[in-house]
């Protein structure tokens, strides 16, 4: 083993945060220094040349001052016996760089801890707990001890459970020790069946059975028979859900039987490379819509980052594994937790009710979990466009008496939508003899028993089993697998996949039997053919672990050659682990021990286990009305704006890429001031169409404490009032996912669940014409623990989260909450605000945000009293949206009318005057009730026609003209002549932002968080704006395109790159012939660059950014003789041009020694905020010789920014001056007044002199961090000025490239 020192691992503010944590625990630590340590496992000694190459490879990241460390060494490394994603990717790079001597690389972090006194053993343990994740890491106290990382242990054998001698008792003991969560009748079932077989079960068989038959996988409660209040019920819960499909099957292509549901989409030109020529082209066909929403609550409670990350990853796999290959497209995440209690910002309603030690508190869940979910989506390359966040934790009198209700077991929702070809919606038959394949990463000893563990109440299982059930993520691996699936479905009728499932709960022990069973086959498997990174694992651990990023497939023998070629090109590992058999029998052979750990008929594993029967009793709640004493409207407004459910969510949004794909038509951020208040998420179906897809969410979970049915109806209603803001048309085009969370078995909750399912499945959805073709249930939403001998519990309310999906006719019609004034819309004229109140003046306050911030529950909650009226509302809004009658639209939800109008004013940067006299005499109830409805802004010229449309749909009595919009800072509610509330809009905007600021300051660089917060106090901020030196609607490439010649453009990608398709689309539109080129094509000689005139290196996360962003990719070129020669020759050909964007920018900057005129280029390193930044940032084109920016100097326009490592790093001031003097700076960040800026977030990464793009001395090669290819269409811009046509301003760059060739 060779040890190589790396660069410092922690910036100054990260060290300070760690020291602060030490102080909080009274640890006498005075200083901490950390640096990376690299360990190389070698086949033989390195010669000098190889050592120099390896040292260069392992020099990466920002330059932080090094010093000779002192103090106690604590070396954090991956757990011995495991291979980290960092290790596998960096080893790949080393091998691609020709370092064949390297068997494996691994990385640790050496912490040197200085203290005022010698630390005791307990204190050292406390420091260790702060610096490592015990699930995946270990701590050594000397560097040499890291050799344990490379020791290979002996495999453990299979174990038996002796039921033939020990009977039922033996299985009961195994049930506890293995954490199987088997029910009594399942234990009887297993004893009976194995006794019949005349043999003892192996532990692996029992674990496999437990996973396959867990509540998590089998949904026993939803399939159970029910008796309520002594009366047998006709239908199971699942039957009532299916009733929605039986009533309204319209537009549903697949429901209840696959990994995701499918509905009909639009006929569009899907843009992807021709499988033979690899040239990108449009394929005119149906792009059907697939949809799925998952929960990952249990793992997120135990370990938030990986819990949320693998939640998103699993849901993405569900989409990819739909039919015989789908394409994930856009994502959503949602969180419900107990109160945050932010240190120093605790709120009056936040009481501390305690928690068990094994789960994480709500604050840490929300500091870490969202980062995990965002990081997976970012690295995979899926925009995250939607979400919600609710906090609830209170002692209330509910139907079960006085108790604490809250979310110590959080809800973590991960969902999304994608597209699928018509011929791929249904799975095919699995032929006998088909290869049964595991595609993706290796088996690791993590995530054991996740299905069974998540089916128990938090705190019931042993702590080590809880931790064992958490998984770890490697999104770049999943991206590679998805690229394989993409290449397969792009073959159309020749798609080699016959059957596919994702690997989720229960690992391959669930996925492979399910694959065989669904394909009506058996399977014969070889245990030692399963790719395995921990050789010491027992058969149970290999077969049942939940290692992520894996799919199981069936491929006919005659298609294996094509499948193998695709996997090699995409560098996606796979293994044939078995063969499909005619007989429905499952066999698993182990060549190492020469035995058969599994040998059982399929019908014992997945057969008719006993059906559950639930007995339930209805309990009614008697809760008093809200006590008004001491509630002042002004203070109520402030409190409600600080409630996390209502407060600004920027800290949850800018961490997630919202522009990747170039197909995003509506993200969360709205208008020139980029305020996060969008009603719904919208994507375009392709680059040649305005058809698209939309997603929205609805949930009102605290209402279930008063009325189960109302809570469920409101969730459906809110999803509709949100999605009504876009152009859907017929309500039957909308399909819902229903995610049900319940503390099953808690007094009154089972009957309540039945009531809620009936309310939507049998009543509301059929009345509206809505279908629920997909969903999930999580039936153990309770946390129990002991504290000082007292048993405690926190029980969640019944929680239904609805996600609505719909096909969009025209994405341009989407209306946002941004109020318009003549400042933002020329020639606007007078406008009015109209409230449509679906509560019909009832103004009920039960379980509202207002009630919560005063520690109350109230009596009657809002409800959907009239389904016909709700449908009329949707139809009316669709008419008005389609006919361009609405300037602004915002649904009424948490926080009521007050919050609806406040958010509209924040987005419009304007004032509001509203008179609420005709809405009721109780001003508090009028302002803060959460009845369904919406506020719209309309031109006074259109007011009569809008009101008559509302009346024609039965809404006349509940439609009220309530006020006007003003270009001012005044936010005023009156009731006749009486002023009810008069505030500064800016002041309210700042209060609304406090929560996001506090969370950002705790999690990211606090200096950046403070700058962003300060900027929100500036009422004079003009917002995003555009100033162009050219005509955006002129196509300067048109004359060259007309000639018919198409110059050849290499669209270059490496493993982990995810922005290549939109880049190809932009160059294709500009008249180029765009060709898909993977780095593996170059390294294997399948592609040569001398055939191309242009080359573009695309954005993403090459090699997961393990050796610095873009650095691994660059080094695999620099240190590979053949690749180096090709690239050098290309850059030296004078007729060529090149572009590097984001990851491609980072990569080309590291190739500068090969690029003429690039010698001054800087490096790009970690953002100053130390966070991935997804922003819509204003930039100005500088005067330079770049062929891309010809005629654009002085132009100022916004652009998509999405990166974690975009900060320009120069050697010193002299280097920076030389760059400026050379005239090669091509782009700078500017503020909204047009000045180059260092202020965050206008300068999202802290680059000196606001530099974000450079070119070479002759202008042939340009690099830039922002993404022009994602916003080349006007509809793909988060905000664009009126008057832009189909092409956005950034399309000019690509047209310039075409014009330059002539």
Swiss-Prot record:
Matches recorded under InterPro entries? Class_I_gatase-like (IPR029062), FGAR-AT_N (IPR040707), FGAR-AT_PurM_N-like (IPR055181), PurL_large (IPR010073), PurL_linker (IPR041609), PurM-like_C_dom (IPR010918), PurM-like_C_sf (IPR036676), PurM-like_N_sf (IPR036921)
Enumerate the active-site residues: 1142, 1267, 1269
HAMAP family the record matches: PurL_1 (MF_00419)
Q: Quickly give the catalysed reaction.
A: N(2)-formyl-N(1)-(5-phospho-beta-D-ribosyl)glycinamide + L-glutamine + ATP + H2O = 2-formamido-N(1)-(5-O-phospho-beta-D-ribosyl)acetamidine + L-glutamate + ADP + phosphate + H(+)
Encoding gene per record: purL
Recorded E.C. number(s)? 6.3.5.3
Query: What family classification does the UniProt entry report for this protein?
Result: In the N-terminal section; belongs to the FGAMS family.
A cellular component term from Gene Ontology for this protein is: cytoplasm
Gene Ontology terms, MF aspect = ATP binding; metal ion binding; phosphoribosylformylglycinamidine synthase activity
Q: Does the keyword Ligase apply?
A: yes
How is this protein named in the record? Phosphoribosylformylglycinamidine synthase
């Amino acid at each position: 083993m060779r040890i190589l020192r790396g660069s410092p691992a922690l910036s100054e503010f990260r060290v300070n945060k760690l020291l602060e944590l030490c102080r909080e625990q009274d640890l006498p630590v005075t200083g901490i220094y950390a640096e990376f340590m690299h360990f190389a496992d070698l086949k033989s000694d390195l010669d000098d040349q190889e050592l120099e190459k390896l040292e260069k490879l392992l020099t990466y990241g920002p330059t932080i001052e090094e010093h000779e460390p002192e103090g106690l060494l604590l070396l954090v490394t991956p757990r011995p016996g495991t291979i980290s994603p960092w290790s596998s990717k960096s080893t790949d790079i080393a091998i691609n760089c020709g370092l064949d001597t390297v068997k494996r690389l691994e990385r640790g972090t050496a912490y040197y801890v200085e203290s005022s006194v010698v630390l005791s053993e307990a204190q050292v343990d406390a420091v260790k707990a702060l610096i490592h994740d015990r699930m995946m890491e270990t701590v050594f106290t000397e560097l040499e001890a890291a050799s344990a990382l490379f020791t290979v242990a002996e495999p453990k054998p299979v174990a038996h459970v002796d039921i033939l001698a020990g009977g039922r008792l033996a299985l009961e003991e195994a049930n506890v020790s293995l954490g199987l969560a088997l029910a009594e009748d399942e234990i009887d079932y297993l004893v009976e069946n194995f006794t019949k077989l005349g043999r003892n079960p192996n532990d692996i068989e029992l674990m496999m059975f437990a996973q396959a038959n867990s509540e998590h996988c089998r949904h026993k409660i939803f399939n159970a028979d029910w008796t309520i209040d002594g009366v047998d019920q006709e239908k199971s819960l699942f039957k009532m859900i299916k009733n929605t499909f039986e009533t309204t099957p319209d537009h549903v292509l697949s429901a209840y039987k696959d990994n995701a549901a499918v509905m009909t989409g639009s006929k569009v030109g899907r843009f992807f490379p021709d499988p033979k020529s690899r040239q990108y082209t449009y394929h005119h066909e149906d792009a059907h819509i697939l949809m799925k929403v998952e929960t990952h609550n249990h793992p997120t409670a135990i370990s938030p980052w990986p819990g949320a990350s693998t939640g998103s990853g699993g849901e993405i796999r569900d989409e990819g594994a739909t039919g015989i290959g789908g394409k994930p497209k856009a994502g959503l995440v949602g969180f419900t937790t107990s109160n945050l209690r932010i240190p120093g910002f605790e709120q009056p309603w936040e009481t501390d009710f305690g928690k068990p030690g094994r789960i994480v508190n709500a604050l840490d869940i929300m500091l870490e979990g969202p980062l995990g979910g965002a990081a997976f989506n970012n690295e995979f390359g899926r925009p995250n466009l939607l979400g919600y966040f609710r906090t609830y934790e209170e002692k209330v009198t509910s139907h079960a008496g006085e108790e604490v209700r809250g979310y110590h077991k959080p809800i973590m929702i991960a969902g999304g939508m994608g597209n699928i070809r018509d011929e791929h919606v249904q799975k095919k038959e699995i032929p006998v003899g088909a290869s049964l394949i595991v595609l993706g990463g290796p088996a690791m000893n993590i995530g054991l028993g996740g299905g069974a563990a998540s089916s128990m109440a938090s705190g019931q299982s042993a702590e080590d089993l809880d931790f064992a059930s958490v998984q770890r993520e490697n999104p770049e691996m999943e991206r590679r697998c998805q690229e394989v699936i993409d290449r397969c479905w792009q073959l159309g009728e020749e798609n080699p996949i016959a059957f596919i499932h994702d690997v989720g709960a229960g690992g391959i022990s669930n996925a492979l039997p399910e694959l065989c069973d669904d394909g009506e086959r058996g399977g014969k498997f070889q245990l030692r053919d399963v790719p395995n990174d921990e050789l010491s694992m027992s058969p149970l651990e290999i077969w049942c672990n939940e290692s992520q990023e894996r799919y199981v497939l069936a491929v006919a023998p005659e298609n294996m050659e094509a499948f193998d070629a695709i996997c090699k090109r995409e560098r996606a590992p796979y293994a044939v682990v078995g063969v499909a058999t005619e007989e429905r029998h499952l066999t698993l052979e182990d060549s190492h021990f020469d035995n058969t750990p599994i040998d059982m008929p399929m019908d014992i594993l997945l057969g008719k286990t006993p059906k559950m029967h639930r007995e339930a009793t209805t309990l009614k709640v008697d809760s008093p009305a809200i006590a008004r004493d001491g509630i002042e409207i002004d203070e109520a407004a402030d409190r409600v704006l600080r409630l996390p459910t209502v407060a600004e969510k920027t800290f949850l949004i800018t961490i997630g890429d919202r522009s990747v794909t170039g197909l995003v038509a509506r993200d969360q951020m709205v208008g020139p001031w980029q305020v996060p208040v969008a009603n719904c998420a919208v994507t375009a179906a392709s680059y040649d169409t305005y058809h698209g897809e939309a997603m929205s969410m609805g949930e009102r979970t605290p209402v279930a404490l008063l009325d189960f049915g109302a809570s469920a109806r409101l969730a459906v209603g809110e999803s509709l009032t949100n999605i009504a803001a876009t152009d859907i048309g017929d309500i039957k085009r909308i399909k819902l996912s229903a995610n049900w969370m319940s503390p099953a078995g808690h007094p009154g909750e089972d009957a309540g669940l039945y009531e809620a399912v009936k309310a939507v499945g049998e009543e509301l959805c059929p009345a509206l014409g809505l279908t629920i073709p997909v969903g999930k249930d999580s039936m153990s939403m309770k946390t129990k623990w002991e504290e000082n001998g007292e048993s405690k519990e926190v029980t969640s309310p019944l929680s239904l989260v609805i996600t609505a999906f719909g096909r969009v006719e025209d994405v341009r019609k989407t209306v946002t909450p941004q109020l318009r004034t003549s400042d933002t819309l020329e020639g606007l004229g007078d406008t009015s605000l109209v409230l449509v109140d679906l509560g019909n003046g009832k103004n009920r306050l039960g379980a509202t945000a207002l009630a919560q911030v005063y520690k109350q529950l109230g009596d009657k909650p809002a409800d959907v009293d009239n389904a016909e009226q709700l449908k009329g509302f949707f139809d009316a809004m669709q008419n008005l949206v389609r006919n361009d009658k609405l300037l602004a639209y915002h649904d009424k939800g948490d926080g009521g009318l007050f919050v609806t109008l406040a958010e509209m004013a924040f987005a419009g940067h304007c004032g509001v005057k509203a008179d609420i006299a005709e809405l009721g005499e109780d001003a508090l109830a009028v302002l803060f009730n959460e009845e369904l409805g919406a506020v719209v802004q309309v031109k006074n010229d259109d007011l009569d026609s809008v009101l008559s449309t509302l009346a024609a749909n039965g809404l006349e009595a509940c439609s009220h003209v309530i006020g006007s919009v003003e270009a001012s800072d005044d936010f005023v509610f009156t009731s006749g002549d009486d002023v009810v509330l008069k505030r500064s809009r800016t002041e309210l905007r700042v209060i609304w932002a406090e929560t996001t600021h506090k969370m950002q300051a705790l999690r990211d660089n606090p200096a950046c968080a403070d700058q962003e917060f300060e900027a929100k106090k500036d009422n004079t901020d003009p917002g995003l704006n555009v100033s162009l030196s050219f005509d955006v609607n002129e196509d300067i490439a048109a004359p060259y395109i007309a000639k018919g010649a198409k110059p050849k453009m290499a669209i270059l990608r490496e493993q982990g790159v995810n922005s290549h398709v939109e880049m190809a689309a932009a160059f294709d539109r500009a008249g180029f012939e765009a060709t898909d080129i993977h780095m593996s094509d170059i390294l294997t000689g399948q592609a040569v660059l001398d055939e191309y005139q242009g080359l573009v290196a695309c954005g993403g996360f090459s090699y997961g950014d393990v050796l610095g962003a873009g650095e691994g990719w660059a080094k695999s070129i620099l240190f590979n003789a053949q690749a180096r020669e090709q690239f050098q020759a290309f850059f030296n050909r004078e007729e060529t041009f090149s572009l590097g964007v984001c990851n491609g920018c980072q990569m080309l900057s590291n190739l500068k020694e090969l690029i003429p005129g690039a010698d001054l280029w800087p490096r790009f390193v970690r953002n100053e905020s130390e966070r991935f930044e997804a922003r819509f940032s204003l930039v100005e084109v500088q005067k330079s010789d770049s062929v891309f920016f010809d005629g654009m100097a002085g132009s100022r326009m916004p652009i998509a920014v999405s990166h974690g490592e975009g900060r320009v790093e120069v050697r010193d001031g002299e280097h920076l001056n030389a760059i400026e003097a050379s005239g090669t700076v091509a782009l700078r960040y500017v503020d909204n007044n047009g000045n180059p800026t260092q202020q965050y977030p206008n300068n999202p990464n802290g680059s000196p002199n606001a530099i974000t793009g450079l070119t070479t001395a002759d202008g042939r090669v340009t690099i830039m961090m922002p993404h022009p290819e994602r916003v080349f269409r006007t509809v793909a811009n988060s905000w664009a000025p009126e008057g832009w046509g189909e092409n956005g301003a950034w399309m000019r760059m690509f047209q310039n490239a075409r014009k330059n060739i002539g």
